């Protein structure tokens, strides 16, 4: 495995360079902007390319060292790509709503995870001795918990890095990560606040193609990190009967 490659053309065709309307900008993003066209800010991809590469290197190195990565994207257009990318590389995700304290109050979240596992076991066992109403109520509780924390139920502890789509919407997640010293890789649109983002990646955070591209690249960087970790521990990845994770070819946008 190798760190995923990407081209300026891919970024352009995915619309990574398109920011928001000029009146919606955050002035702190000015250093990352190329200019504006038709009252739309244009993000400077000459900066995005090296910053995205550095972010991918960081993700790979964290995972190669045994770290966990949490994908965070709860807006509608990010929800599915975030979950799919995290599953593809055997990592973790929050893709519906960030619950306050999800990182800073991990003990409470752990209790909710234990309850979710308990419900899974109860309902998997054909719910013997339970009435239809009890089964319905337990199923509803399970589904609610699964939607909220299903993506982190196997995480086993705090993540070592979070990857964020839309820093404005995920402001609480970023605040919690910073408080705990957890590294943050984040996509910064023209209306974002870059303060406190250790690994900023200037780019459109609304276009579906752009979001899918970011998620795919980060997922493949994780897989490269897993491969390095296995190699370092003496596992012959090439000799495995089946690859642990199927890696799709990078889609040329």
From Swiss-Prot:
Gene Ontology biological process terms from the UniProt entry: translation
Key words, A-Z: Ribonucleoprotein, Ribosomal protein
Acyltransferase as UniProt keyword: no
Disulphide-bonded residues: none
The keyword Cell membrane appears for this protein: no
Any one GO cellular component localisation term in the record: cytosolic small ribosomal subunit
GO molecular function: structural constituent of ribosome
Name of one Pfam family that matches: Ribosomal_S2
InterPro entries recorded: Ribosomal_uS2 (IPR001865), Ribosomal_uS2_bac/mit/plastid (IPR005706), Ribosomal_uS2_CS (IPR018130), Ribosomal_uS2_flav_dom_sf (IPR023591)
SUPFAM superfamilies referenced in this protein's UniProt entry, alphabetically: Ribosomal protein S2 (SSF52313)
Family (UniProt): Belongs to the universal ribosomal protein uS2 family.
Protein name, per record: Small ribosomal subunit protein uS2
Organismal lineage: Bacteria, Pseudomonadati, Pseudomonadota, Alphaproteobacteria, Hyphomicrobiales
The encoding gene: rpsB
């Amino acid at each position: 495995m190798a760190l995923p490659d990407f081209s300026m053309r891919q970024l352009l065709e995915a619309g990574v360079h398109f920011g928001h309307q000029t009146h919606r900008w955050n002035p702190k993003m000015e250093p990352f902007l190329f200019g504006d066209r038709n009252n739309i800010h244009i993000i400077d991809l000459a900066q995005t390319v090296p910053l995205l590469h550095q972010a991918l290197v960081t993700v790979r190195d964290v995972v190669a060292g045994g770290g966990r990565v949490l994908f965070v994207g709860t807006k509608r257009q990010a929800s599915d790509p975030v979950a799919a990318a995290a599953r593809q590389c055997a990592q973790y995700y929050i893709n519906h709503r960030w619950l306050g304290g999800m990182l800073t109050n991990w003990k409470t979240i752990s209790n909710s995870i234990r309850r979710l596992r308990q419900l899974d076991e109860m309902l998997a066992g054909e719910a013997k001795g339970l009435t239809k109403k009890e089964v319905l109520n337990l199923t509803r509780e399970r589904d609610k918990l699964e939607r909220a924390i299903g993506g982190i139920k196997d995480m086993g502890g705090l993540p070592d890095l979070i990857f964020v789509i839309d820093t404005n919407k995920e402001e609480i997640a970023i605040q919690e990560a910073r408080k705990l010293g957890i590294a943050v890789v984040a996509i910064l649109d023209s209306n974002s606040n870059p303060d406190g983002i250790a690994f900023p990646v200037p780019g459109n955070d609304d276009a579906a193609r752009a979001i899918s591209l970011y998620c795919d690249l980060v997922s493949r960087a994780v897989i490269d990190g897993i491969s390095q970790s296995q190699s370092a521990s003496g596992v012959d990845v090439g000799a495995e009967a089946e690859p642990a994770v199927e890696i799709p070819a990078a889609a040329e946008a």
